[in-house]
Curated annotation (Swiss-Prot):
Designated name of the protein: Probable nicotinate-nucleotide adenylyltransferase
Pathway this chain belongs to: Cofactor biosynthesis; NAD(+) biosynthesis; deamido-NAD(+) from nicotinate D-ribonucleotide: step 1/1
Any GO MF annotation of the entry: nicotinate-nucleotide adenylyltransferase activity
Pfam family, one: CTP_transf_like
Alphabetized HAMAP family for the sequence: NaMN_adenylyltr (MF_00244)
CDD domains per record: NMNAT (cd02165)
Gene Ontology annotations of biological process type: NAD biosynthetic process
Reactions catalysed according to its record: nicotinate beta-D-ribonucleotide + ATP + H(+) = deamido-NAD(+) + diphosphate
PANTHER family: NICOTINATE-NUCLEOTIDE ADENYLYLTRANSFERASE-RELATED, PHOSPHOPANTETHEINE ADENYLYLTRANSFERASE
């Protein structure tokens, strides 16, 4: 099975996350996209103390009506810092017959050289680099860390890199939905509308549980 992996804090999940997942699934003919909420991401401080369980529930509600989307609590169960390499290793062991497509933003790909055991990630999965709204993405071969650049071959016409392991790095320009989780948190605290920025089920959950109203 061809499975996309989309990780994040999802604090909260919103329509841009969902659209990215849908576009990657459609363009690369993926059979599933697995959302993986982070327990404690190494490159981002969580806003306030919003628990993994609450963020997990918001993702679950957001994807409930899409049969191609699923959710994993693998990072919540593991605890500690949520390193991508550990998550991908666990998934690879649990589903050895499946092919994974790790979905990340272009800004994250530019910073991948700072990730824990980053070189090993390319041995475990394909990577799908999605351009952020308004961003001008560098060609994939220019964004690679120098230390591993010689392990790749760049196919300019396809905007794709192939790794010595046989995996690929794809570049996809996503639909320009300029929505951010921080914006949603701010609007909620101000008592303003967040309608159409995220699924109605998540909006209702945020209101009922008074999430973000206490500064979280």
């Amino acid at each position: 099975m061809r499975i996309g992996i989309l990780g994040g804090t999802f604090n909260p999940i919103h329509n841009a996350h969902l659209r990215i997942a849908e576009e990657v699934r459609d363009r690369l003919d993926l059979e599933r996209v697995m959302f993986v909420p982070a327990a404690s991401p190494p490159h981002k401080l969580l806003a306030g103390e919003l628990s993994f369980e609450v963020r997990y529930e918001m993702v679950r509600l957001a994807i409930a009506d899409n049969p191609f989307f699923t959710i994993s609590d693998i990072e919540g169960k593991r605890g500690g810092t949520s390193y991508s390499i550990h998550t991908l290793q666990e998934l690879h062991l649990a589903y050895p017959a499946d092919e994974f497509f790790f979905i990340i933003g272009s800004d994250s790909f530019l910073d991948i050289g700072s990730w824990k055991e980053y070189a090993a990630i390319f041995n475990l999965c394909n990577i799908v680099v999605v351009s952020r709204p308004g961003a001008v993405a560098d060609p994939l071969d220019k964004a690679l860390p120098v230390a591993i650049a010689d392990r790749f071959c760049y196919h300019a016409a396809e905007k794709r890199l192939t790794h010595s392991s046989g995996h690929s790095v794809y570049s996809i320009a996503g639909t320009l939905l300029d929505i951010s989780s921080s914006e949603i948190r701010t609007l909620t605290r101000q008592g303003r509308s967040i309608r159409y920025l995220l699924p109605a089920t998540v909006e209702q959950y945020i209101k009922e549980q008074r999430i973000y109203n206490d500064g979280r």
